[in-house]
């Protein structure tokens, strides 16, 4: 590893730590020539399947497409950057866990929608309106109705919450 300051290859590791749930090793290094310190990150090479588009084209997985889609959907919503990153990482892990060489883009789109629905309903509807190419307000309203019906089903299936003791 070359020093980013003097380009010398001689350096020593002064500290190593795991980060990002153990998937990355952060190393603090000191150049033996110029004595300046710098940080490097080591991670396992991630292999993703090819993405098969609706028209049959195949392209390499592009994390930034997911990030950008989520950012647009969540713009001006109470969703933190950490929540977006966790969502992207979860989708990446799911793709890697499939063990497939090719995955239809629809699988990724549906997974994004599933996760957005749990994260923020407005962001979910925004994403769905683009992803599903709503043609008019009726399709938009149908999606909202389906969202409300799913919520009602989930509430009926949820175990009742324990009564709150009001200290009386």
UniProtKB/Swiss-Prot annotation:
Coiled-coil spans in chain: none
| Cofactor note text | Binds 1 zinc ion.
Sequence intervals crossing the membrane: none
Which UniProt keywords are given for this protein, alphabetically ordered?
Answer: ATP-binding, DNA-binding, Metal-binding, Nucleotide-binding, Repressor, Transcription, Transcription regulation, Zinc, Zinc-finger
Q: Tell me, which GO biological process terms does this entry list?
A: negative regulation of DNA-templated transcription
Q: Please give the InterPro entries that the UniProt record associates with this protein.
A: ATP-cone_dom, NrdR-like_N, RNR_NrdR-like
Q: Which cofactor does it need?
A: Zn(2+)
Q: Where are the zinc fingers (unnamed)?
A: 3-34
Occurrences of domain ATP-cone (ranges): 49-139
Glycoprotein keyword on record: no
Question: What is the similarity comment for this entry?
Answer: Belongs to the NrdR family.
Q: What does this protein do?
A: Negatively regulates transcription of bacterial ribonucleotide reductase nrd genes and operons by binding to NrdR-boxes.
Please name the NCBIfam families in this protein's record. Answer: transcriptional regulator NrdR
> What name does the UniProt record give this protein?
Transcriptional repressor NrdR
User: What gene makes this protein?
Assistant: nrdR
